[in-house]
Design a protein with these regions (language model features):
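Glycine-rich phosphate/adenylate-binding loop
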Residues: 2-18, 131-135, 140-148, 160, ...
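Hydrophobic/small residue at the entry helix of a nucleotide-binding pocket
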Residues: 52
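Conserved N-terminal Rossmann-fold NAD(P)-binding element of oxidoreductases
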Residues: 46-48, 71
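Conserved S-adenosyl-L-methionine
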Residues: 61-67
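N-terminal charged helix/coil linker that caps or initiates catalytic domains
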Residues: 1-45, 78
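Conserved SAM/SAH-binding loop
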Residues: 116-125
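Glycine-rich phosphate-binding loop and adjoining beta1-alpha1-beta2 segment
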Residues: 67-108
Length: 273
């Protein structure tokens, strides 16, 4: 490299750094130099890119996280438009991972996105990961997959944020954070707790070390001749509101940011919004 080209490269790098600072410097002012650097350097995994996980991934990209792994096997459908950030007329039929990766590239061009078109199960986890995760966000709607993620995270000490069911909820302000042991009014997380205790040796009393995002709001049952309710986070049967699903996703992202910015803290913030 000639002195001239080296100088040009240095200028380009300086311009890129300045651009990133303009985009994401607000986080530095909030979390301080060290916390900001931790967030920027983090590798965060989001499992499930529906009405919750898609907003989580977007929030992480807009917070300057430099490495994301996005895991989901589904394609964008018209029924996703009311609650999923990557669901647009122009993205119908695309893999959710690809549609969201393209969106993230426009938000944070320097973000390294690994798009993994798979559903998590005991046969492929953690093999789906190409590198160590600093935090995993479980926004999937399958209890077996949630148990695989939670058991692995508890065994290896990887910070995990597990999200409960958002379908049938209307009160976004009632979303809260608690240890899995203290979660109520969420059958999916209750089933996860039972699986961890019965199949993975989790204690019957005391904290379980799994940070959960959930709501104690009673579920509003589908009106009229709606399809059968399946209790899942992806809202097939229950009605769904983006105001609620996105709030779940944003709270999960906030927990992940706290965990990577302040790794000594246990479980991020607790309590209601």
């Amino acid at each position: 490299m000639t002195p001239g080209s080296a100088g040009a490269a240095a200028v380009a790098l300086g311009n890129e750094d300045a651009d990133l600072e303009r985009r994401f410097g607000g986080l530095r002012r909030l979390y301080g130099d060290r916390g900001y650097a931790q967030v920027r350097a983090a590798h965060v995994v989001v499992v499930g890119l529906g009405g919750v996980g898609s907003w989580t991934a977007e929030a992480l990209a807009r917070s300057g996280v430099d490495a994301l792994t996005l895991v989901d096997l589904d394609q964008v459908a018209e029924s996703n438009v009311n609650r999923q950030v990557q669901a647009l007329g122009s993205t119908l039929g695309m893999a959710k991972t690809d549609a969201l990766a393209a969106r993230i590239a426009d938000i944070h061009p320097g973000c390294e996105v690994a798009a993994v078109e798979e559903f998590v199960d005991e046969s492929n986890w953690p093999g789906l990961l190409a590198r160590r995760a600093d935090v995993v966000i479980d926004a999937c709607d399958d209890v077996r997959a949630k148990a695989v993620l939670a058991a692995w995270a508890r065994a290896g000490g990887t910070p995990l944020v597990s999200v409960g069911a958002a379908g049938g909820k209307r009160a976004a302000e009632r979303v809260e954070v608690a240890d899995l042991a203290d979660v109520t009014h969420d059958p999916m997380l209750a089933a996860l707790r039972q699986r961890l205790r019965k199949q993975h040796g989790a204690p019957r009393s005391g904290p379980l070390g799994v940070c959960c995002v959930f709501s104690r709001e009673p579920v509003a049952m589908p009106a009229g001749d709606a399809c059968d309710v399946d209790g899942s986070l992806n809202c097939h049967g229950y009605g769904s509101s983006v105001a609620v699903t996105a709030t779940f996703g944003m709270v999960a992202a906030a927990q992940a940011i706290e965990l990577v910015a302040f790794p000594g803290a246990k479980g991020g913030h607790r309590g209601r919004l």
